[in-house]
Amino acid sequence: MATYTPMIQQYLDIKAQYPDAFLFFRLGDFYEMFFDDAIKAAQELEITLTSRDGGGEERVPMCGVPYHSAQGYIEQLISKGYKVAICEQVEDPKTAKGVVRREVVQLITPGTVMEGKGLLDKENNYLATVTMFDDGTYGFAYTDLSTGENRITLLASLDDVMNELYAIGTKEIVISSQFPEQYQQLLKERYDVTISYEDETVIPEGFTSIVEALQQDKLKITFGRLLHYIIRTQKRRLDHMQSVQVYQVDHYMKIDLYSKRNLELTETIRSKGRKGSLLWLLDETVTAMGGRLLKQWLDRPLLDRKQIERRLHMVETLIHHYFERQELRERLREVYDVERLAGRVAYGNVNARDLIQLKKSLQQIPALKDIVEKLPDHEAKQLANKLDPCSELVDLLERSIQENPPLSVKEGNIIKDGYNETLDRYRDASRNGKAWIAQLESKERELTGIKSLKIGYNRVFGYYIEVTKPNLHLLPKGRYERKQTLANAERFITQELKEKEALILEAEEKSIELEYELFVDIRERVKQYIPRLQSLAKTISELDVLQSFATVSEERHYVKPQFSDNRELIIQAGRHPVVEKVLGAQTYVPNDCYMNKERELLLITGPNMSGKSTYMRQIALTVIMAQIGCFVPAEKAVLPIFDQVFTRIGAADDLVSGQSTFMVEMLEARNAIVHATQNSLILFDEIGRGTSTYDGMALAQAIIEYIHDHIGAKTLFSTHYHELTDLEQSLAKLKNVHVRAVEENGKVVFLHKIEEGPADQSYGIHVAELAELPASLIQRAKEILAELEQQEQRKEQPSGKNEAVFEQLSMFAEEQPSKEESHLSKKEKKALEALKSVNLLETTPLEALNKLYEIQKLLK
């Protein structure tokens, strides 16, 4: 066994307690890392890997970063999912006997970040915990340490857990060490998160209010696990975590994770970014707090009609009061992130500049209150009453903190004159002492006759009298004590100067010490306001989101939705909000949608790329916007309250779990069929396309019949199986609609307009004509299509309610007999095969043109 130096052994002992974290080990002005940590950190941070003697036979790998710039390096590691343990020297090296005592003062993890670039203004940084109980239920809790927001619930299944995790976008999940391995693997695959472990579940002392709020043992166990993990990693008590909100998922519209992705509510499928999502469109918030709340509202649309209508009424009021809304926006822009400032106060890392930001924010509250109180709306009056100006706190900060304080809280110049008498005396002593020294310099020049004599100061020798060598003979004997000899001068001290120096330096030192003590006292007094600041932040956030809805609704000409009591859905001139913004209102084609108890299932047919998917998405987005309390993109909207939204739109394979497009289709279809109620909204786009024609049609028909007969949910079902349109004859509540397309002078024009009835034909061959494929090939394609249609009619008819023939709305039928192909030349066969292989559902317009160009080249 290797024998290491005491310092390296100390490192190893501490590292053993934090095996899954990088240990930032404080050595003087650096944080050092050793052994495997050093090798890995050097790679991840792109810093130099070196080595040092550790007492053993081989040198120890080592790398380090300066402590004053460590934050940036820590953020890099955290952003990559690592943990960092900060190990500080906890005793003065000058007085230490042997190795300086060191302790880990904080374990920073992806879910416990409190400051820095890792915290985005308009995004929460959630830490979640999942507890699995013997009866198959799950306790689920999450917190944002930077804001003090805590929420908890009980969930019935692992699917519900997955949906909640996706909704909050957590960075880290805390579980029991006994959590099943297969479920841990599932969490890691589905979400790129850090998994951490905590087995202690008893709520610690000091959290009485939380114990009282959590009546069920399951909730106490779940939140206890979360609290213990936070205390263990942060090594401190967090005063802003004294409340928890118990919520029920069935109080909100359920949107499963597949549907949230398909609808691009908070991020786009391709870029995984905000731009192009519904959140991006709706975000006209001007505070960080409002931006975060907007996403929370979008993740959890309401079911309570009264709550929805309260929001809508406030939005309507703000739309009708433009000047008040603009003034409200201007005032809100002056408000800093009060929620996170309160978190920093509780955490103990708030600085004087933070307190000035808090003061400036609170100074806006009276004006905000005045604006909101004047609005003719009951909800506005209630919000105004919640705008707490915290006048005593503003007064404290106004009296105590300098307007432009330094970033450091230990270098003085933080506290205002007049706040503390003792501090004022120290400052007077320091200022007067310096003035006395200036007078002494004049007096010494006069006494000695040396005009070049000067009094200076440095940290090594303190104050001194400097005389050039040619003038040394002019100094009176016995009065000056030599301190330092320079090349051209001598430096002296007098008893009088020595005594004054002691007074000045003592005053400055005591002044800085007292300032820090006063700052800590002020910080502790501010802590008492944390609950009020958190409540105020919540109200400001609500105001910001509501004005954001009003701003977007007015700019985009949205309409206030009404809610029906008979499950009727009427949307006149509805638009897809995001597509309309990108294309422009003049370009976008609006569409109607009408559904009621006799018209519950719309079967949508039409050519590919004609707008079926966009139409379906816009219905869902309209419903969601209405239930978060926003106006909607339509000329008129009367909607039922939907309890759930399910979608199957898009054909991206689940590459992570190795599931095919068809398997993903079936899983998403199952999710809707098992959980949907008659109050749900289902959007199915091209179900069944991932398998053979007959399998696909059979499944599509069976799903339609099941929804129609057993669920009764409002359903939009698009299909390329034209035969399914005959179901209108046998299913009373199914109606056909189609996307209109017309031929003009031999050209196909997609009008993107939804009309009653089924689509009457396919336009695949017309598209091939537009691409200028050889006339002989086009003619042959038409002949083959006609022959195939005749053959299909002779084949086995679909069973049950649908007596239609099998005919696909696609470029060509999928199955073509080899005897037909025998009439073609080799070139034509190759071109036809290439054309058949094009999957229009997964091909962009540009890719299609490139493919057609290749086919043309084959025939030349």
Swiss-Prot record:
GO molecular function, one term: ATP-dependent DNA damage sensor activity
CDD domains: ABC_MutS1
Signal peptide region: none
Keyword DNA repair: yes
Gene Ontology cellular-component terms listed: cytosol
One Pfam assignment: MutS_V
Binding sites annotated in the UniProt record for ATP: G606, P607, N608, M609, S610, G611, K612, S613
Keyword ATP-binding: yes
Keyword set, alphabetical order: ATP-binding, DNA damage, DNA repair, DNA-binding, Nucleotide-binding
One BP annotation, GO: mismatch repair
Gene3D superfamilies: 1.10.1420.10, DNA repair protein MutS, domain I (3.40.1170.10), MutS, connector domain (3.30.420.110), P-loop containing nucleotide triphosphate hydrolases (3.40.50.300)
Family: Belongs to the DNA mismatch repair MutS family.
Function noted in UniProt: This protein is involved in the repair of mismatches in DNA. It is possible that it carries out the mismatch recognition step. This protein has a weak ATPase activity.
HAMAP family the UniProt entry points to: MutS (MF_00096)
Name of the protein in question: DNA mismatch repair protein MutS
Organism: Geobacillus sp. (strain WCH70)
